[in-house]
Amino acid sequence: MFDLMAVTKALADENRVRLLAALEGGELCVCQLIELIGLAPSTVSKHLSTLRSARLIQGRKNGRWMYYRLADDQAPRTARTAVAWLLGVLDGRKRILDDKKRLEKILETMPHEACHGKHPSGSYRKNTNSR
């Protein structure tokens, strides 16, 4: 029952749904997701935490950066079924199509720059550490 309640709670927010749809294309850095959704980093992190708690997504840390992807076959059946259903329902929706176009531009113009503090808009502080 916990899985069902956690999944329905996670899907009850438009921004979390948008995050799931963005991850359909593969793994993304949290910085890229922040740029796509256009919310404060703390808000996006909270949404990602909710999705992760529901086991709809998985994350991995690489240095200072977190990367997220849709949950794999090891996720509970409830989570896998919910994600498959959701992505089917969202297919062709204007907001999701707009997000996909925006994400393409984000990935073209700053595949890793946002993660390293070099976003052209200046919305992120420059990283002074050499990498």
Regions found by a protein language model. Name each.
Residues 2-43, 49, 65-75:
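N-terminal helix-turn-helix DNA-binding core of bacterial DNA-binding proteins
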Residues 25, 74-131:
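C-terminal regulatory/oligomerization modules of transcriptional regulators
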